[in-house]
From Swiss-Prot:
Sorted UniProt keywords: Cytoplasm, Hydrolase
Coiled-coil regions listed in the entry: none
Top-level EC class as recorded in UniProt: hydrolase
Compartment(s): Cytoplasm
Oligomeric and partner information: Heterotrimer of UreA (gamma), UreB (beta) and UreC (alpha) subunits. Three heterotrimers associate to form the active enzyme.
Pathway annotation: Nitrogen metabolism; urea degradation; CO(2) and NH(3) from urea (urease route): step 1/1
Catalyzed reactions per annotation: urea + 2 H2O + H(+) = hydrogencarbonate + 2 NH4(+)
Name recorded for this polypeptide: Urease subunit beta
Family of the protein in this entry: Belongs to the urease beta subunit family.
Gene this chain is encoded by: ureB
Originating organism: Burkholderia thailandensis (strain ATCC 700388 / DSM 13276 / CCUG 48851 / CIP 106301 / E264)
Biological process terms in GO annotation: urea catabolic process
Single GO MF descriptor: urease activity
Domain of life of the organism encoding this protein: Bacteria
Length: 101
Protein backbone atom coordinates (compact mmCIF):
# COMPACT_ATOMS: atom_id res chain seq x y z
CA UNK A 1 0.00 0.00 0.00
CA UNK A 2 1.15 3.54 -0.79
CA UNK A 3 0.63 6.30 1.84
CA UNK A 4 -2.66 8.03 1.07
CA UNK A 5 -3.72 5.30 -1.36
CA UNK A 6 -7.41 4.46 -1.49
CA UNK A 7 -8.70 1.13 -2.73
CA UNK A 8 -12.38 1.62 -3.56
CA UNK A 9 -15.16 0.21 -5.64
CA UNK A 10 -16.36 1.76 -8.88
CA UNK A 11 -18.11 5.12 -8.85
CA UNK A 12 -17.49 8.47 -7.23
CA UNK A 13 -16.33 8.79 -3.63
CA UNK A 14 -16.25 12.07 -1.72
CA UNK A 15 -13.63 12.42 1.00
CA UNK A 16 -14.39 14.41 4.15
CA UNK A 17 -18.05 14.73 3.08
CA UNK A 18 -20.02 17.16 5.21
CA UNK A 19 -16.94 18.41 7.05
CA UNK A 20 -16.30 22.15 7.26
CA UNK A 21 -13.27 23.47 5.36
CA UNK A 22 -11.47 26.80 5.43
CA UNK A 23 -8.66 28.38 3.41
CA UNK A 24 -5.77 30.20 5.05
CA UNK A 25 -2.78 32.08 3.68
CA UNK A 26 0.39 30.71 5.30
CA UNK A 27 3.89 32.24 5.12
CA UNK A 28 7.14 30.59 6.17
CA UNK A 29 9.00 33.41 7.95
CA UNK A 30 11.90 31.13 8.92
CA UNK A 31 15.18 30.31 7.21
CA UNK A 32 14.49 26.57 6.91
CA UNK A 33 11.81 24.53 5.14
CA UNK A 34 8.84 23.41 7.26
CA UNK A 35 6.89 20.27 6.39
CA UNK A 36 3.43 19.60 7.85
CA UNK A 37 1.84 16.14 7.77
CA UNK A 38 -1.74 15.33 6.81
CA UNK A 39 -3.09 14.81 10.33
CA UNK A 40 -1.10 17.40 12.30
CA UNK A 41 -3.29 19.85 14.24
CA UNK A 42 -2.57 22.93 12.10
CA UNK A 43 -3.06 25.35 15.01
CA UNK A 44 0.11 23.87 16.56
CA UNK A 45 2.49 23.76 13.58
CA UNK A 46 5.99 25.25 13.64
CA UNK A 47 6.03 28.85 14.92
CA UNK A 48 7.96 29.95 11.80
CA UNK A 49 4.69 29.60 9.88
CA UNK A 50 2.68 32.81 10.04
CA UNK A 51 -1.13 32.63 9.66
CA UNK A 52 -4.37 33.09 11.62
CA UNK A 53 -3.74 30.43 14.28
CA UNK A 54 -7.04 31.04 16.06
CA UNK A 55 -8.92 30.20 12.85
CA UNK A 56 -6.90 26.96 12.47
CA UNK A 57 -7.83 25.58 15.89
CA UNK A 58 -9.51 22.19 15.35
CA UNK A 59 -8.38 21.83 11.72
CA UNK A 60 -5.81 19.82 9.74
CA UNK A 61 -4.63 19.96 6.14
CA UNK A 62 -7.24 18.68 3.67
CA UNK A 63 -4.80 16.35 1.88
CA UNK A 64 -4.52 12.58 1.51
CA UNK A 65 -3.52 10.59 4.60
CA UNK A 66 0.21 9.96 4.82
CA UNK A 67 1.16 12.97 2.70
CA UNK A 68 2.53 16.39 3.67
CA UNK A 69 2.87 19.99 2.50
CA UNK A 70 6.30 21.65 2.46
CA UNK A 71 6.73 25.39 3.01
CA UNK A 72 10.05 26.71 1.71
CA UNK A 73 11.73 29.69 3.48
CA UNK A 74 10.01 32.92 2.42
CA UNK A 75 7.21 31.05 0.65
CA UNK A 76 3.57 32.10 1.00
CA UNK A 77 0.78 29.79 -0.11
CA UNK A 78 -2.92 29.23 0.44
CA UNK A 79 -3.90 25.92 2.05
CA UNK A 80 -7.25 24.24 2.59
CA UNK A 81 -7.93 22.89 6.07
CA UNK A 82 -10.63 20.43 7.12
CA UNK A 83 -12.26 20.22 10.53
CA UNK A 84 -11.08 17.42 12.82
CA UNK A 85 -13.66 14.67 13.33
CA UNK A 86 -14.21 11.96 15.93
CA UNK A 87 -14.00 12.91 19.60
CA UNK A 88 -12.63 16.39 18.65
CA UNK A 89 -10.00 16.23 21.38
CA UNK A 90 -6.34 17.07 20.73
CA UNK A 91 -3.43 15.73 22.78
CA UNK A 92 0.30 16.04 22.19
CA UNK A 93 1.78 18.05 19.32
CA UNK A 94 3.00 21.27 21.04
CA UNK A 95 0.71 20.74 24.04
CA UNK A 96 -1.36 23.87 23.31
CA UNK A 97 -4.75 22.12 23.66
CA UNK A 98 -4.41 18.84 25.62
CA UNK A 99 -8.11 18.06 25.69
CA UNK A 100 -11.45 18.74 24.00
CA UNK A 101 -11.65 21.51 21.42
Amino acid sequence: MIPGELVTGDGEHELNAGRRTIELVVANTGDRPVQVGSHYHFHEVNDALSFDRAAARGFRLNIAAGTAVRFEPGQTRTVELVELAGARAVYGFQGKVMGPL
